């Protein structure tokens, strides 16, 4: 995938490989459950099928990588809303490089503080402000947040981002209007809702960030 974002953050790249499943008849909780199962499966698969590579990483790159991913595999992935995360960050006895306030797109330093210092393990952040998320994410009843989630893990920050998709045509149209989007170019997408859809969800799993290497250049090809 490719996205327009500055390169100031080593974990926020403009181009990277992803796996992007879509799940029919699923809500946000279903989405998070599948994400947790998939991440744990991938960790176990690497430990079982690439033991020499994992030992190499542990010896040459990150001496704690096997222990860290094993802890992720054995952990229950916690849940925390975006608003709760902002409250924790505002109360933190830490000076962040980037300002903290409700409505910001969290930086890696914020994400890692939440999962490493507040939770001490993997955590799903949910219910983000609609202004900082994509137009197709389902609007919550408060009309301020959307049914989105980001999985944060120690040592990395955001690993997976997902959401329940907006299946209601009128709400989707309003969200697009609020963002000033050209609906004519996305009429085909809107027609999928106009002529019948279903509750569904999906996510993007950033394969690039699963490597223990601190230099993504070595795993980006």
Each model region followed by its residue ranges:
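Single conserved hydrophobic/aromatic residue that forms the stacking wall/gate
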Residues: 1-11, 209-212, 216-220
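Class II aminoacyl-tRNA synthetase-like tRNA-binding/catalytic domains
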Residues: 5, 9-26, 191, 197
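Short conserved micro-motifs at the rims of enzyme active sites and ligand-binding pockets
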Residues: 9, 29-33, 135-138, 163-164
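A generic structural motif
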Residues: 20-31, 155-157
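A residue-level signal for conserved active-site and pocket-lining positions in enzyme catalytic cores
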Residues: 21, 85, 125, 162, ...
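Hydrophobic (often cysteine-bearing) scaffold residues that line and stabilize catalytic clefts
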Residues: 31-35, 81, 168, 203
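Metal-assisted phosphate- and nucleotidyl-transfer catalytic regions
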Residues: 37-153, 178-198
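Active-site pocket scaffolds in enzymes
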Residues: 163, 168-211, 221
């Amino acid at each position: 995938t490719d996205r327009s974002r500055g390169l100031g953050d080593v974990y926020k790249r403009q181009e990277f490989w992803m796996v992007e499943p879509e799940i029919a008849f699923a809500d946000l909780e279903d989405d998070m459950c599948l994400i947790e199962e998939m991440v744990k499966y991938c960790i176990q698969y690497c430990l079982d099928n690439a033991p020499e590579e994992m030992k190499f990483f542990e010896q040459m790159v990150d001496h704690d990588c096997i222990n860290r991913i094993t802890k992720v595999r054995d952990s229950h992935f916690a849940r925390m809303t975006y608003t709760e995360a902002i409250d924790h960050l505002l109360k933190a006895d830490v000076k962040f490089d980037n300002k903290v306030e409700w409505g910001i797109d969290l930086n890696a330093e914020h994400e890692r503080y939440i999962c490493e210092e507040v939770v001490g393990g993997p955590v799903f952040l949910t219910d983000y402000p609609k202004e900082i998320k994509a137009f197709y994410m389902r609007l919550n009843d408060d009309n301020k947040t959307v049914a989105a989630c980001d999985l944060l893990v120690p040592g990395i920050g955001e690993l997976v981002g997902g959401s329940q998709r907006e299946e209601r045509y009128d709400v989707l149209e309003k969200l697009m209007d609020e963002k000033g989007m050209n609906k004519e170019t996305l009429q085909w997408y809107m027609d999928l809702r106009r002529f019948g859809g279903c509750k569904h969800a999906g996510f993007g799993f950033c394969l690039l960030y699963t490597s223990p290497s601190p230099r993504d250049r070595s795993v980006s090809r």
